[in-house]
UniProtKB/Swiss-Prot annotation:
Domain named UVR: residues: 209-244
Keywords from the named record: Cytoplasm, DNA damage, DNA excision, DNA repair, Excision nuclease, SOS response
Subunit: Interacts with UvrB in an incision complex.
Stated family: Belongs to the UvrC family.
PANTHER family noted in UniProt: UVRABC SYSTEM PROTEIN C, UVRC/OXIDOREDUCTASE
BP-aspect Gene Ontology terms: nucleotide-excision repair; SOS response
Superkingdom of the organism of origin: Bacteria
GO molecular function: DNA binding; excinuclease ABC activity
Lineage of origin: Bacteria, Pseudomonadati, Pseudomonadota, Gammaproteobacteria, Cellvibrionales
Protein name as catalogued: UvrABC system protein C
Amino acid sequence: MSQHQPPPVFDSTSFLKNVTKLPGVYQMYDADGAILYVGKAKNLKNRLSSYFRATGLTPKTHALVKRIQAIEVTVTPSEAEALVLEHNLIKSQKPPFNILLRDDKSFPYIFISEGEPYPKLAFHRGPKKKKGQYFGPFPNASAVKETLNFLQRTFRVRQCEDSVFRSRTRPCLQYQIGRCTGPCVEAISVEDYAVDLAHTAMFLDGKSEVLQQELQVEMEQASQALDFERAVVVRDQITDLRQVQAQQVMEAGYSNQDVVACASESGVHCIHILYVRQGRIVGSKSYLPKTKLDSTEEDVLSAFLAHHYLGGAAMDVPPHIIISHKLADQLIIGEAVEKATGKQLKLTHNVRTYRAKWLAMALEAARQNLKNHLNNKQTLVARFESLQDILGLDETPNRIECFDISHSSGELTVGSCVVFDQNGAKKSDYRRFNIEGIKAGDDYAAMEQVLTRRYTRLQKESSSMPDLVLIDGGKGQLSKAKAVVEELGIHDMMLIGVAKGTTRKPGFETLVLTSGAERVLKADSAALHLIQQIRDEAHRFAITGHKQRRDKKRRTSVLEGIPGVGPKRRKELLVHFGGLQEVLRANVDDLAKAPSISKKMAQEIYNVLHSE
């Protein structure tokens, strides 16, 4: 009988004899051919030799070296180009021993279109394909929406979609409440609209002082011309601008720059960025990088800067970046960014006056956010460990999935799956399922369909299975879940039903096990709090999905029963009038102006919509 053979030991001596001293990138693989680590080096031979010395390795680096079975190297013309390649490989392959960012979503911008008489103002995220002006980046979507709301109130530039704008025959509600000048019906001239648009762009460029001076002159000219209505409008714009400016920290003479600070505690790191545009702090954002090796704050900051500013066209790179630590590869990072983006970048760690204050703000924010994260993580870990004790498990669950079903009287059923680990919710792994082909209101069949689709997909993709699955329901739902799991041949997955109890109040839940046993937890149980948190999130996610599906159906359901009005005509009506409410308000003559709608059909539509 053959015995299991251990994997062969990597022959580092033979390998290192043939390694070049040129700059480049190296990739380390384990016995299964899976990527372990990606690194760069100015001198590949010296850098790779350092992994195989007899002493001086950190415990985690030693653990990495023990798993190495193969190393591939790629020579590059310079260390800067090695940094660019390293960044791309880390992003695409996600090696487990590299520092990885959790949030890689592109940043939002404000967009002003070009090439039309009445350009629009809009939220934008993603590649900059459309022709126009992009302002940003902003730290998050909320900051963009808050700014758009202010601009709509102050300068009244349109923010509607082009399809709605082109199809309107009368002003919308925004015009009626004084938040739009009505360009869709030419209630404002192209010339006057261009002035409002220019003022909007000046504000977004951070030129508030110059803009206020222009508006002051315009207000005085309007008063002298006895155009008091216009003078009042401009006066209100000046007032709004001054109120916003009073809330900002200003420093004349400084151009656009980012302030990046790194703080660490208990082996966890936090990066915080302040975005300064035209001397004004326009926003901030925190990151919690995953660190697998014994990384210093300098290591983490260096890796972050390379990842962040080589992240593609969605990121605007300012000419100056203030950093909290002096880095050995500061110049290399700047050179790599310049090669990748064509923009010069200067990194500075030694600053004074207002820039020193900005750096202090960023450091304090990093420390505070890190403290909050550690507190939250400790709470989560304690809850996971409590759940382990309650269930008598040998190991703490690492991944928990929870399912819920939502519908209205059995219609438009939606199933949800949420995922938690000891770091909290993994929203990128959340999934929704539109349920079809079951009897209305049959929650058991709905749950069976959701679980079958979910775990058939995970099996097909060879994706990670959860350690524990929570089913929102009692013995009936749990038995369906058990049957699905057994049918799919899945083992080592614990199933638990979460029954709400007779009172259906939080704190009185009963845990139902597949053995038929039940557990009632104390109201102050940390395990119960974790289950409630996950179950409530699954419930929220299911309800949100159901409401979205229901609202989408309602937007067209009123028109579905009209003879001769199929999907194409329904869509044309909604686009022409800008929404269902406008269709309902339209008279027969208005309806007849829509594409493909004759006078006779317009009368038919009107009769159906207004019949009692």
